[in-house]
Every structure is written in C-alpha cells, then in structure tokens.
C-alpha cells in the first residue's frame, strides 16, 4: 500500500510539474510564409502541447492551418495537430483546414493550437504547416531560459545586424567564423588566422551587453523574418552618377542539405541593363561546402539587383530584390529553412529595409489574354491607374507610420511603382489588334513618365521595359512603320509627301484593303480557335484578292521602291530611330532610346551593326552608353574568330533533303543517319529571345545527359545565314553530337506542321526506332523526370 501511495505521489508531482511548464515569449525563427505569426506562449501538458499564436493579417488577409500541421523535434519525430479550441479569454476557436479571418477593426487575432504532447525535456522544436515543400512554419522554437535562444543580434542604437551565433558557425563583421569556444556567457570565434572573443552580459530591458574584442555594445536579439525598423532617420539621397563598376556580394547560406547540393544549389543574380533595354543580365556562382559564396556583379550605377538562392533549373529557396552600387561590398545571409535573407555591414540599411514584407501588398491591375477592344483595354488600364494611386497612398501611410524609414527606401519605391504602373499599362498595347494603346491613355502616360533628374537613370528595371514599350507604341503609330509593312496608310503617306502618285483604281484598292484590315481585326477580336481563324482568314484573303493584286503592283513600281528604300532603309530598327528623333528628342531619353535600338538590333540579329545603323552611334550623348554599344558591336564583329572551322563542321546543307515536300519525309531523312540513337530536336530562330536563352544554358543540360547517346538536331526558322552561324559560334553549339540545318522556308514549315509546333522554341524527342515524342519547352528543367522519360524511350 505504501508503494502504491508513493507511486501515486510521484505521478501527482509529475503532473504538477507539467502544468507549470510554460514558455513565455519563446524565441523562434519565421520563414518567408509566416511573417505575420507570433508565438506568445507554449504550454506543455501531459496529454497535449498548446501553441498560443497572435496573428496579424495585413490588408485583410486570411490565415489557414492545415490539418496536416505538426510539431517536429530535433530527433525527427513529429507530433500531429489535434485541434484549435480556444483555452484563454480573447482567443477564437479554430478548426484546422478552415480559413481564419482576423478582426476587421484591428487586423489581428489570437488562437490556440493543440498538438500531441511533446516530451517533457524538449528544449527546441519546429511548427510546420503541412508537408508541402513551401509550407510555412515557425522554426527553432526555443526555451526562452536559454540565453542564446535566438542566434541573431542587432545594435539597438544603430539598428544594424551585428552578430549571428548559429549552431555550427557564426557570422560577424561580414564574415563566416568557426567556433573555438562557445558557452552561454563566452564565445571565441576563429577563421584560422584571427580570433574574436565575445563575452555576454546579463539581460536588462531587453538588451544584453556584449563585449567584442574589448569593445562594449548593447545588443538585442531579434527573430523576425527581416530586421526590425531602424531607430534613427536617414536622409541620404541616391547618387545619380553613371559609371561602370563591380559590386562584390559575399554571403553565407544556412541549413543546406545533401538534397540541395544534389539539386544544383547556387546563387543567381539578375540585373537590368538600361542600355540593352528589356534584357536582364544574369550571373551565377556556386556555394562551397560551408555555405559560403562570393560573386562580382557588373553595374552601371546605383541599380536594382535581384538575388536568388536557386536549385534545379528554376526553383528557388530564397530571394531578395535589393539595390547595390558600383565598388560597394555587401554581405548577405540566406537561410534555406526560414527563407530569411539579411544584409550585414556598415552600409546595409537600405538593403535590409528593402526586404521588409509589409510594403509589398500591391494590388494587381490585371491582364488580357489575347486580343481585346479599346474599351476592355481602357478598363484594365484604369485599374492599374487606380492601383497606382492606392500604392502611393500606401507608401504615404507607411512613411507616416515609420518616420525613421530612409529617404532612399521611399524614393525608390515611389519611382519603382510609378514606372511599374507605366510599364504594365503600356504592355496592354499587345492586346490591341494594331499593337497600340488607346489615345485616351496618352495624357496620363505623358504626365507621369518624366525622368526624375534626382534619381539614378539605371535604378529601376521597370524603366527598361517601359521605354521599350513606349518606343514600340510610337513606332506602330508611325506612317513609316505602316510603309515598312506596306499597309494602306503607308501608300497614302507617300502620296501626301509627293513621293508617289496613285490612280483612282489604286485608291479604290487601298480603300478595299482598309476594309479587309477591319474584317481581319474583327476576326481577331472574335476569340475563335486557331483553326477557325485560319479558315475565315483565308476566305477574307480570297474576297479581297483583286485589290491585293493592285497593291502588289504598286510595290513593284520603281517610284515606290525608290521612296520605300529612302524612307525605310534597314527596316524596323531604322524606322524606330526616325520615330525616336521625332517623338523623344530630349536628353537623356534620346540617348537611352538610341542605345537600346542598336543593342536590340545586335541581340536580335546576332550580328554587328549595318552601315545604315552605325551613324546612330553619334546620337548617343551619354559616353558610357555609347562605349557599351560599341563593345557589343566589336563582340559580334569578332564572334566567329577562331571558330569558323568548328561551326562549318556541324552545319549541314539543305541539299540533304532536296526535292522533299512532306514534313514527315523530310524529318525522317534528317534523322536517318542517327537510327539507334536518341535525337533531341530543337526548333528555334535567331530572332527568338527565349530560344537563344535556352541555347545559352544548354551546356548544363548536355553535361547532365552525357551518359545518354543523344544527337542534338537544331532546325533554324527564318534565320539569316550570318546570324545563324554567329549564334552557333557564340554559344559553342559545335560538339560532335550537334547537327544544324537552316532549311528553305517551305521545308521548315512542313516539318513544323508535322511536329505540331505551338511556338518557339519547340522541342521533340525521337527515339531509337524513329518514333516522335512531344515535349513541353520546360520539361528538361525537371532533370529526374526528364531522365526517366529518356530511360523509358524504346
């Protein structure tokens, strides 16, 4: 009896100790998808563990916790969610898998989530919402009694991130250190050459006194996804200087797993280039076994830089849109678990402010799939205008709420959102049947599109796309463009200039051609499928065949050809320059447009500037921009230097299929020499940006597939011979297993119809027996799945 009583007493004591175990305000790490969650308490009970959560929902968002949610301890064991019943006053009942809306009046609420009981000796655990790869979570939830329960510490006077004390390494002074010693009160860091001694004092008013190599400073731990707001104002302005230089970005990637390594984990950088237009530059570097990396980033001034911690072909674990300056040195932390990214250094304030998520609630204005009438375009454009006004109001409210936020942060966001709205509105021109915006929008665009002389020209990437769209829009409206396309208004414009005389019969034919164009436009707006569009379009062409013959006869007249070549010369890019001279004559816009015209010509054609375009160089008044364009021209002048023999060895003559007209017969003849091998068919064009981007990166794919006996068959669509050879040489597509053809248009079209292409690039696999297999153009980005497809081929 005494033994039973003793056991009962011990059990009661154990239950009592459970009931008293509560973590108040435990430390934890937020990941990218949980920045609005805060753990106020953790209750440990013998039959359950309870998480008490405060939820903030910016812009009236909702929250959902999956019924698959669980707690996870360091040994890998999981403890499932069992309910969401309120246990305290002020909490709301919650049912897992349902949507939880916070109060409309204060945008926050409180709930309690119950889980299977954690072990009594638990010191740290994770809360993970489901098993999806990007499920949100609260990680490293740690007993607050542990002094170093949060690894990240900031200087309370300056707001800067000073120290990261992680399990395996430390981050201090923009470097990664190993531990020579680590206790709750003393840490010694070493890099093998230098030691840093850190002593940690007692907590007082949320701070601890750290002594780092004899220097004392008050630090406070933080666990938010981004740094807390800075305590002092910063009125520094951006430098507007245009200059070339490299920013050096070093960093540390935490919580890398073997799976990440196997999936080609890397750092990828994208930077806009205002000289080259809407073409982002890309730079990549590897991450070493400790998680460290360094990359040099060429810049043209203070500008936006997009940083991605990527794996596989296109997946990314963390990302940051930041601003860097030539010759600047920066350090960034990327965490694979929490998705956190933070900057450390003497001049990292702007970079950390830009990582805040609170300002990112930008409403989407909408897009139009396919062609639309002007009324529909205006409706979407007005939504973008309304949303821009909302954006400005949000920024004003944000500035009032956070008076210490830096001037550069606000200046950038105002500028970026302005050009973001302009770019998205201008992009709606692609939904118009004549590729131009309704005139009703020109006033708003003109009013809001001025270049701010107090901001760096190269700062925002949206300015690159906006300028290109604006130039294209003006070009499409130009009579020169209509002349270039031999449209009715082009003939009438030549007549108005006294350069062409038209007969009554020719005027009648031009009037009929205008009616034909109206019918075509109405057909495009009808939303018919591709087959029906072709059928009806052919009927319209038959209906107006007689007037088309008259117009064709005009184009064969010598007076027309003389006027045409005088006004249009080298085609689209020459016409663009004429339009820029009349529509955008003021600096610096004129120089930017001229730079982009020449750069885009070379990128599109993959060849140096023609004689008709070289004089445009003198119109570029910004010396650095002109120098960059000239370097690009020299690159294409010398692109085949030393490569002619290799290129000629892999290009094949179209005479191989001479006389064949059937698409299947032509393709069978092309692949006949490679029976018994897998053929990877790539249908591309020198004019196709996505095609060239994939070709540029194709060597990585080929390296991954080196164990397969693959022949890479490249068929170029509508590609000038010089451009075609230049692309082959530029991207070194000259391996022995590469085969290149530039077939006559009819034969190329026959193959494309046979393989049923829907766009460019198009990829197909031809198995060892000659069977044709369809591929989506992104299928090769999932390598394990793609290799499985190859393994299953006969």
Predicted regions and their residues:
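Conserved helix-turn-beta segment immediately C-terminal to the redox Cys motif
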Residues: 677, 695-715, 793
